[in-house]
Swiss-Prot record:
Family note: Belongs to the TRAFAC class TrmE-Era-EngA-EngB-Septin-like GTPase superfamily. EngA (Der) GTPase family.
Gene name in the database record: der
Residue ranges annotated for the KH-like domain, each copy included: 353-438
Name listed for the protein in its UniProt record: GTPase Der
Domain spans labelled EngA-type G: 4-169, 177-352
Nucleotide-binding in keyword set: yes
Subunit: Associates with the 50S ribosomal subunit.
UniProt xrefs under HAMAP family: GTPase_Der
Highest taxon in the source lineage: Bacteria
UniProt organism field: Trichormus variabilis (strain ATCC 29413 / PCC 7937) (Anabaena variabilis)
Amino acid sequence: MGLPIVAIIGRPNVGKSTLVNRLAGEQTAIVHDEPGVTRDRTYLPAYWSDREFQVVDTGGLVFNDDTEFLPLIRQQALAALHEASAAIFVVNGQTGPNSADEEIAEWLRQQPVPVFLAVNKCESPDQGSIQASEFWELGLGEPYPISAIHGNGTGELLDELIKHLPPTTELEENNEIKIAIIGRPNVGKSSLLNAFAGEERVIVSPISGTTRDAIDTFIERNGQNYRLIDTAGIRKKKSIDYGTEFFSINRAFKAIRRADVVLLVIDALDGVTEQDQKLAGRILDEGKACVVVVNKWDAVEKDSYTIYDYEKNLEARLHFTEWADTIYVSAVTGQRVEKILELVTKANEEHKRRVSTSVINEVLEDAVSWHSPPTSRGGRQGRIYYGTQVSTQPPTIALFVNEAKRFNDNYRRYIERQFRQQLGFKGTPIRLLWRSKKVRDVESGSANRATRV
């Protein structure tokens, strides 16, 4: 990436995510009063005193407990530290140092990066200095009293931090494609991301809902850069309490909006559920390119009709995203995983594609000759004067007609099908804007406007 990385390390519930949000200037890491909310490592851009860098939020470190996700969180923290240029060790100034802090400090002293000790929750500057002084005993140098919530003391910490960061590599113009990986809990989104990245970048567990943040991972294939956004699994609203999971789902929807292409991951064993349909509808509403990824295909018992039957079911259940490519993969074995990126690249190209006005009107002329527009009860027939593409991402075509309400849904779908059959647009939704226009306005338009259909 070219930017120095700063790892944020500490035991659970000391305010690491709050500090990350303070440094990055946005609430991206989930902050909640439930201990251990951050499980994976999350990369965010930060800026201080003309220096750009990335901060990496990690899960809460606990060395003397191997239950649940704790060994995996340690692995994530170690991976973050391995790629970091510096680390900020966050401790709780209100409770003072404890044995967990001492264990982490001992581990950090063995690491080859400079470590800065941030004593958080020092809300009073006078009292904060006293609270911070207790942490000299950790042997990591000067403790910096800070308040991640209010920002007190973070300037002094960052002033010292940036002195130890290596020079920023000049970044080339980035041609990355942003991909959001979405789906219900436990369909294999994180396994898929790890298969792309070639490392255990995200905690993978059979327990539903292991991933809580939207996390960015950067990969490159054949000169093309991809930014992969893994997201918390999306459940039905009635099964969500308004705590951490509520914020995760909200962030997953934001990840869809950030993305160029969305991977809708479906569990091959469960088939298409009502929630999958709602997610597909969300992708369509946001106008995003999409690839449908049917995961766990290796676990499906197959005969000569399996793929045919599955495709018919997908076509029936996801008919409103029939324009999206579908691929059957196994994130665990790696089967066809790399092929996904080829489909993503093609979908992204179609999403950004622009078609000339003359070509659009040739398609319209043929479509109208094959199937005339509807006629009103009074005998007045609908007329399409001309069409022109007005934007991309998604491709959006304005159709100027004599009376928009005269064109019913069936005819509108027919025109969209004609555009797809003649022009492609595989992998992306297209939007048609039906605009009423009086014929005299059309005839008085500029001479180089599209020919009337």
